[in-house]
UniProtKB/Swiss-Prot annotation:
InterPro entries: Ribosomal_uS2, Ribosomal_uS2_bac/mit/plastid, Ribosomal_uS2_CS, Ribosomal_uS2_flav_dom_sf. PROSITE patterns: RIBOSOMAL_S2_1, RIBOSOMAL_S2_2. GO terms for molecular function: structural constituent of ribosome. GO terms for biological process: translation. Belongs to the universal ribosomal protein uS2 family. PANTHER family: 30S RIBOSOMAL PROTEIN S2 PROKARYOTIC AND ORGANELLAR, SMALL RIBOSOMAL SUBUNIT PROTEIN US2M. The keyword Ribonucleoprotein applies. The gene is rpsB. One of its GO terms (cellular component) is cytosolic small ribosomal subunit. Keywords: Ribonucleoprotein, Ribosomal protein. Pfam families: Ribosomal_S2 (PF00318). This is Small ribosomal subunit protein uS2.
Length: 301
């Protein structure tokens, strides 16, 4: 799984939530406090939650499964496309077509139409048509390309989706939940975390924060895919050179096994005073305090 540090989170502005008047009370457990009318997200929680999400993505991809990257807001479009392409996964970054998951059979027809038009544009068939017909087909192709380019080669439903801003991608999240597809999402202080399977509390508006999370999830995918390749290679080599294999298992594997827990321990024990790191001036918001008091009162009844 990919590692992320407190320094990276702070530099990317991941801790900045929305204005205190724009919040979802269900996010209270992920809020550290507020400063100047802005909620401050608890980055210690973000570190832990991201670690869980990253491990899940790596494990999924190590089994040969597929992740769909989703981010249609302007700030997320480039990062979603670039990182999904980098890790060899699929993406939607322009507009989520209603029924993309729940009506996949129909969407596949549009995907096949896009593939057909792409072939026509490159194999010379356009030369046999009139200029007016070519213009019409190109208009159709560009429209389909804008919405479906990222899933043009996706042959089946994804095994999970990674979402930037679960509020903005509410339809995608709803469709995924309806089909039992796990949702990994960057969730800001104005979002409902209960509709997400793997919550990553953080700023879902800042470019640097979006790119940080998206690139780290892509790294998790790459790590998982690499595991698939390693397993296939090991299977092919089994019985070919048992002596070399025995040495590798006896010497190299333990080193890797020691390194992994060390890295995980470092990530878990990165204890930073957020108030000191952010320059102070942070206080528990009355809204958060009241919400917590109400929750405790309800539990005691």
């Amino acid at each position: 799984m990919a590692n992320i540090t407190m320094k990276e989170l702070l530099e990317a502005g991941v801790h900045f939530g929305h204005q205190t008047k724009r919040w979802d009370p269900r996010m209270k457990e992920y809020i550290f406090g507020e400063r100047n009318g802005i909620y401050i997200i608890d980055l210690q929680k973000t570190l832990k939650m991201f670690k869980d999400a990253s491990k899940y993505v790596t494990d999924m991809c190590a089994q040969g499964k597929v992740i769909l990257f989703v981010g249609t807001k302007r700030q997320a479009q480039d990062a979603i496309a670039e990182e999904a392409n980098r890790c060899g996964m699929y993406y939607i970054n322009n507009r989520w077509l209603g029924g993309l998951l729940t009506n996949w059979v129909t969407v596949q027809k549009s995907v096949k139409r896009l593939q057909e038009l792409d072939e026509m544009a490159t194999d010379g068939r356009y030369d046999l048509l009139t200029k007016k017909e070519v213009i019409r087909l190109e208009r159709e192709r560009k429209h389909l390309q804008a919405n479906l380019a990222g899933i043009k080669n996706m042959r089946r439903l994804p095994d999970a989706i990674f979402v930037v801003d679960s509020n903005n991608e509410a339809i995608a999240v709803k469709e995924a939940r309806k089909l039992g597809i796990p949702v990994v999402a960057v969730v800001d202080t104005n979002c409902d975390p209960t509709v997400v399977d793997y919550v990553i509390p953080g700023n879902d508006d800042a470019l640097r924060a979006i790119r940080l999370f998206t690139s780290k999830i892509a790294d998790s995918v790459i790590e998982g895919v690499q595991m698939v390749g390693d397993k296939q290679f090991a299977a092919e080599m089994e019985g070919v050179n048992t002596d070399v294999q025995a040495v590798a298992e006896g010497e190299e594997a333990p080193a890797a096994e020691v390194a992994a827990p060390v890295a995980e321990a470092a990530a878990e024990t990165e204890d930073v005073d957020l108030e000191a790191a952010l320059g102070g001036g942070i206080r528990k918001s009355p809204a958060v305090v009241n919400a917590l008091d109400e929750a405790e009162a309800a539990e005691s009844l």
